[in-house]
Design a protein with these regions (language model features):
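Hydrophobic transmembrane alpha-helices and immediately adjacent juxtamembrane helices
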Residues: 1-176
C-alpha cells in the first residue's frame, strides 16, 4: 500500500508541475471575474477587510466596552485569516462541479480546480494583508522582527485549507452537496 501511495503522490506532483500554466490561467481568470464589474477593482481586497474591521471594532469596543490594546489589529488579522479559510473551503467544495463542462471535454486532473481556488484565495489574502499593514501603522502597533516569520503559518494555513478543499470537492462530487 505504501508503494501505491508513493506512486500516486509522484503522479500527482508530476501533474501539478505539468498543469502549472493551467493553474495560473484559472487563478488569473478567477481574479479578473471577481473584480470585473467593480468600480474599485482590486482595491476591494484592501477596503473590504478595513470596513469589516471598522464595523466590528465599533461594535465590540464601544457597545461592549472592550479595552483590549490594538483590538482593531486583532480583528483584522483574525478576519483576514478566517475569510481565507472560509472562501478556500467553500469555493473548493464546488470547484469540480462548476468546471464539469471543461472536465468532460478534455482530460484535466480534477484536483487542479480546488488547488487553483486555494491559490486564488491566497493571492486575495496577500492583498488583504495590505489592510493589516495600514491598521498596524494607524494604531501605531509595535513592529517586531518576528513579523518576517509570519509567512510560515500562512503557508501552513494554505496547505491545510487546500487539503480540506480537496477533500470537500471529492465529497461534493460523490454526494452532490
Amino acid at each position: 500500500m505504501a508503494e501505491t501511495m508513493q506512486v500516486s503522490a509522484q503522479r500527482a506532483w508530476t501533474h501539478l508541475k505539468k498543469y502549472q500554466p493551467l493553474i495560473h490561467e484559472l487563478v488569473s481568470r478567477d481574479l479578473k471575474v471577481k473584480y470585473r464589474r467593480s468600480f474599485l477593482g482590486y482595491i476591494w481586497s484592501i477596503l473590504n477587510p478595513l470596513l469589516m474591521m471598522l464595523l466590528q471594532s465599533i461594535i465590540f469596543s464601544y457597545m461592549f466596552r472592550n479595552d483590549i490594546p490594538n483590538f482593531p489589529l486583532y480583528l483584522i488579522c483574525g478576519n483576514t485569516l478566517f475569510t481565507f479559510f472560509n472562501e478556500t473551503t467553500s469555493m473548493g467544495l464546488t470547484s469540480v462541479i462548476q468546471n464539469a463542462p471543461l472536465i468532460k471535454k478534455v482530460y484535466i486532473p480534477k484536483f487542479i480546480f480546488p488547488i487553483s481556488q486555494a491559490v486564488s484565495r491566497f493571492v486575495t489574502m496577500l492583498f488583504s494583508f495590505g489592510a493589516v499593514l495600514l491598521v498596524m501603522i494607524f494604531t501605531r502597533a509595535t513592529f517586531y522582527w518576528t513579523i518576517f516569520l509570519s509567512w510560515l503559518p500562512l503557508v501552513l494555513l494554505f496547505f491545510f485549507s487546500c487539503g480540506l478543499g480537496l477533500l470537500l470537492s471529492a465529497l461534493a462530487v460523490y454526494f452532490r452537496i
